[in-house]
Design a protein with these regions (language model features):
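N-terminal beta-alpha "docking/capping" segments at the starts of catalytic domains
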Residues: 1-47
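Generic structural motif
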Residues: 37-41, 59, 89-93
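Short secondary-structure capping/junction motifs at helix and strand boundaries
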Residues: 63-71, 123-126
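Small-residue-rich loop/turn and linker elements
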Residues: 66-100
Length: 126
């Protein structure tokens, strides 16, 4: 697991013109929706939510474009690795907590870390 953030050199970045056009002139956001067949996961008895968290983490970590962000000074850069963030609802107080689980390439390692973090989050241990 790493937490490195590498600044992008705007002077040499081939996508600078596109970045500036959208960041300065046409600020926007985007979202994506796809149909996804999860039959295999259901047949295996996998828990859908952590499986989807893992899949999103895997895809995001494959593509530099999904790991881009701005630093405190507003300069663009790329994270070496992203980790998953999700919420857990507390029925007794009708509140929720935001949890973070480190991304692991190995699904079994990720799911074990997720279960650990979820148990801590549900018990108020985080």
């Amino acid at each position: 697991m790493s937490a490195g953030f590498r600044l992008i050199d705007l002077e040499t970045w081939p996508r600078r013109e596109h970045y500036e056009a959208y960041f300065k002139n046409t600020p926007c956001t985007w979202s994506m929706t796809v149909q996804l067949d999860v039959t295999g996961l259901v047949k295996q008895g996998a828990k859908l939510y952590p499986a989807l968290l893992y899949a999103c983490g895997k895809v995001a970590n494959r593509h530099e474009e999904f790991r881009m962000s701005l630093d405190e000074a507003g300069r663009p850069g790329v994270w070496d690795e992203l980790h998953t963030s999700y919420t857990v609802f507390h029925k007794d107080t009708e509140t929720f907590s935001c949890l973070w689980t480190p991304y692991y390439e190995d699904p079994a390692e990720y799911f074990a870390a997720y279960q650990h973090d979820l148990a801590l989050g549900r018990g108020g241990g985080l």
